[in-house]
């Protein structure tokens, strides 16, 4: 991309072509890192990022969609926090990767934003890095997945429905839950087989 407009346009085009369990990507990236190199004029960047966030909210109509920011204090990150507080849109959901590199000022800005719009959530980077290594992302609440793949296995299971039809605790644990888990695993395998082997998306 040559400028901030190219950057947001390219991301929005890319999001339309990601296979997903929702109407768009589950994870839209560390958006501050993706956009910060193109923030030259802050007012122009604010305008472009506002359009970007509005487009994501209006076209990926599912709060399963998630963005990460941080840990570093960037111009793009500050603009994203400022606009999130102003716009108060539910999508994308957002997390701040928090570690020793996160400045107090940036963390406080995130807290102020969270008090207005209930995002971003704070992520203990040290804990997730211990489990996943450096190349992870937080997607859809607190699910961690490796960057570059893994969202294919995200599915939804309505546990309440299982409870509603359970005849007893034993029926739930011994029959319904194992059958539901087996169905989820089969669905994941079929999705992965189609996208990775038959559809050749990646």
Predicted regions and their residues:
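Conserved catalytic cores of very large enzyme subunits
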Residues: 1-202
């Amino acid at each position: 991309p040559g400028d901030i407009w190219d950057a947001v346009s390219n991301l929005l085009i890319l999001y339309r072509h990601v296979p997903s369990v929702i109407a768009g990507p589950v994870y839209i990236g560390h958006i501050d890192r993706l956009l910060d190199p193109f923030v030259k004029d802050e007012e122009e960047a604010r305008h472009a990022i506002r359009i970007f966030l509005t487009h994501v909210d209006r076209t990926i109509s599912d709060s399963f969609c998630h963005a990460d920011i941080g840990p570093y204090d960037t111009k793009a990150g500050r603009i994203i926090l400022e606009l999130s507080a102003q716009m108060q849109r539910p999508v994308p959901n957002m997390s701040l990767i928090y570690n020793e590199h996160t400045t107090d000022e940036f963390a406080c800005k995130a807290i102020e934003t969270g008090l207005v719009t209930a995002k971003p959530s704070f992520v203990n980077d040290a804990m997730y890095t211990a489990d996943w290594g450096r190349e992870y992302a937080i997607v859809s609440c607190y699910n961690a997945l490796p960057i570059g793949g893994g969202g294919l296995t995200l599915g939804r299971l309505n546990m309440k429905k299982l409870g509603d039809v359970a005849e007893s605790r034993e029926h739930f644990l011994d029959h319904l839950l194992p059958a539901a888990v087996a169905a989820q695993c089969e669905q994941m395998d079929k999705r992965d087989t189609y996208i990775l082997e038959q559809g050749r998306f990646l």
